[in-house]
């Protein structure tokens, strides 16, 4: 199966500047294509997983993936579909975040010097040295303010009479220049991104056409939500991170294991590398086979992101907890100073300290709703004092929020 054919078959396609021509070119030759990522956290989360799988697909078909870290544009902020001004990231945080993002990506694609090896660039390398007057002189006349004002990302803010700073307005110009720079210096002929980036991508392609006459393309992916409308990458407990220092492989496994029934087939197509025969089997699942399919999906996605050993460990932990009722040492763990337990801590505060809830009020609500357990026993009093008497084997306390979220507190 060819790259574009598989791209469409997996559900990645939303829009392209010239799909027929791009299909023909990618059949005849290998291209370089790029995707940009925000440099605002030390890890990517599953909201970026489709873009990562596209980079992986590019590489598998012999094309060269280029990853752009927005070290330059992160200093400004992208207004695209945001209701509020973006927080500006410091240089120190950008460097730290870039390292973590490469760690996320390296789980899925190979970086190196080979023809199809991925490269990662920070657009600060060329944007930081910009002379503003030179930029206006050389590129300003190619951009139409009239057109920029019609873009949904800008129009939405203007219609709501929300603040849109000059800094953010310039983001579009800088992203367009990124594409031009990569076309000129890396022979990049395709920019990929979410459908909310369409206007920025087209501006870049137009800039290249006007200046150099090169044939380049833009292609976007659909914006994804779960079948219930929830945003991909976010849960009540926080983001579903790809790096294990922010989210354990077990919790990653559990996210996919607990996906909604209606999402199984779509997630299998988007995020896994199941064969067509296996995908066909997913599409014709009987009701009694759904849980087994979820386990298979969770196992494969955890193996892809972490390792086969991590997937096996996560599966074994889940079996012990949910099917055998045991406490497993591989559960996510937090450490609490022994002095805290010796003095005693209220149940709701302990759930908050352990990170199972994001606030003390949420902890109270969890307990009042009969959703909290300590050592598998229901917590009925939010002010109940938890002390060293609750330690199992004198070393751990098991906390549970609902049926599917568990954590061990160690001292």
Curated annotation (Swiss-Prot):
Subcellular location: Cytoplasm
Superkingdom, taxonomy of origin: Bacteria
Binding residues for ATP: 234
Reactions that this protein is recorded to catalyse: tRNA(Tyr) + L-tyrosine + ATP = L-tyrosyl-tRNA(Tyr) + AMP + diphosphate + H(+)
Cellular component, GO annotation: cytosol
Chaperone recorded as keyword: no
Gene3D superfamilies associated with the record: HUPs, RNA-binding S4 domain, Tyrosyl-Transfer RNA Synthetase
Motif residue range(s): 'KMSKS' region: 231-235
GO biological process terms held by the UniProt record: tyrosyl-tRNA aminoacylation
InterPro entries named among the record's database cross-references: aa-tRNA-synth_Ic (IPR002305), Rossmann-like_a/b/a_fold (IPR014729), S4_RNA-bd_sf (IPR036986), SYY-like_C (IPR054608), Tyr-tRNA-ligase (IPR002307), Tyr-tRNA-ligase_bac-type (IPR024088), Tyr-tRNA-ligase_bac_1 (IPR024107)
Domain S4 RNA-binding: start-end pairs: 345-411
Cross-referenced HAMAP family: Tyr_tRNA_synth_type1 (MF_02006)
Binding partners and assembly: Homodimer.
Full protein name: Tyrosine--tRNA ligase
Native species: Rickettsia africae (strain ESF-5)
